[in-house]
């Protein structure tokens, strides 16, 4: 069954409050989203495997631990998920980046695919899917399904704010996928937006609707 981890570090909570504030402009919003993603990356990557390696310091030879095993792929759900990639890459610069393009039909509220490009070795990588908002869960479910169809086996979902309905939907559809979020909001409005949420993350990141 999926594990849901809410990351409540004081720095994350502070920056998330600024992200939620409607007075925060696109420039600051982008920077804050990237910063929160970088802070969350510490917890999201906690279980990456390490191995002992021999190195030489200026003083002597010694044994240290470095990442081993499967490499990482960060896969944003376009377009809003792109805002979290920079923060992840600052801590995992060797990660490859895939892209899944989905948009929400404003009438049906269901996701529609328009783009998919992934690393060829996606099945050999630890995959971190990024999307600031987990609302109905439809986009995340479809993105994870696409990844599995391409061979991905180890997938985690990382978001800034998750609605309880979205968490329930994803855990039921993909019980093997762990979810990491900075906040859990209780409800969705009639338009499928998280309440209180932060509005439309893509619009606020890029200043376009």
Swiss-Prot record:
Enzyme class label: transferase
Reaction equation(s) it catalyzes: UMP + diphosphate = 5-phospho-alpha-D-ribose 1-diphosphate + uracil
UniProt xrefs under InterPro entries: PRibTrfase_dom (IPR000836), PRTase-like (IPR029057), Upp_B (IPR034332), UPRTase/APRTase (IPR050054), Ura_phspho_trans (IPR005765)
A Pfam family it matches: UPRTase
Chain residues that bind uracil: 194, 199-201
Gene3D superfamilies in alphabetical order: 3.40.50.2020
Binding site for 5-phospho-alpha-D-ribose 1-diphosphate: 79, 104, 131-139, 200
SUPFAM superfamilies: PRTase-like
Description of activity control: Allosterically activated by GTP.
Keyword entries, A-Z: Allosteric enzyme, Glycosyltransferase, GTP-binding, Magnesium, Nucleotide-binding, Transferase
Stated family: Belongs to the UPRTase family.
PANTHER family on file: ADENINE PHOSPHORIBOSYLTRANSFERASE, URACIL PHOSPHORIBOSYLTRANSFERASE, CHLOROPLASTIC
UniProt name for this protein: Uracil phosphoribosyltransferase
Natural source organism: Clostridium kluyveri (strain ATCC 8527 / DSM 555 / NBRC 12016 / NCIMB 10680 / K1)
Biological classification of the source: Bacteria, Bacillati, Bacillota, Clostridia, Eubacteriales
